Amino acid sequence: GSRQLFDYTALGDTVNLGSRLEGLNKVYGTRILIDGTTRSQAGEGIEARLLDRVRVVGKRQAVEVWELLHVAGEPQTPLLGPELVALWNQARTDWDSADFHGCRDRLNDLLAKTPSDTPSFLLLSRAEDHIAAGTTTTDWDASVTLDHK
């Protein structure tokens, strides 16, 4: 008890981004998301997979969104094994280079092995949309723009 009352509030881009990432967990069906800066700083201490590059509300530059899969030294089993992470990474590479057919094929393979992987369903849906629309590399931007907080 003191007569002085302090109100501590965190503000700024970092806190806003953290809030956006927390909300994206619902979209991607994930538990913990981190940005590219955190991923880089963590180094070999974690296993993570790049889910997306996202432009959040109020920002022009896309932010890398990573799913934390496993912390080194922790007893739990990683969310995805190395084979599935490699398949996901190949699908992401296809996506980034606008090879939507390759992306679709790899994601179908991944989903045959782990049918409950929400990020794979989301990326597969986007790849199929771009195949249907005839998107080419000349009008391609691999990042996603969020229009809501």
Question: Locations of the language-model features?
Answer:
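Cytosolic regulatory/linker segments at or just downstream of nucleotide-handling modules
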Residues: G18, N25-G102, D109, T114-A133, ...
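Intrinsically disordered, low-complexity, charge-biased linker/tail regions
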Residues: T136-K149
